[in-house]
Amino acid sequence: NLDTPYCFYSGDYGG
């Protein structure tokens, strides 16, 4: 998601 530091990693890592 856009509320996580990994949102840009794959697309939806954190949720």
UniProtKB/Swiss-Prot annotation:
It is found in: Secreted; Nematocyst. GO terms for molecular function: antioxidant activity. Signal peptide: none annotated. The keyword Secreted applies. It comes from the Eukaryota. GO terms for cellular component: extracellular region; nematocyst. Keywords: Antioxidant, Nematocyst, Secreted. Has strong superoxide anion radical-scavenging activity (EC(50)~16 ug/mL). Has an apparent molecular weight of ~90 kDa. This is Antioxidant protein SmP90. The lineage of its organism: Eukaryota, Metazoa, Cnidaria, Scyphozoa, Rhizostomeae.
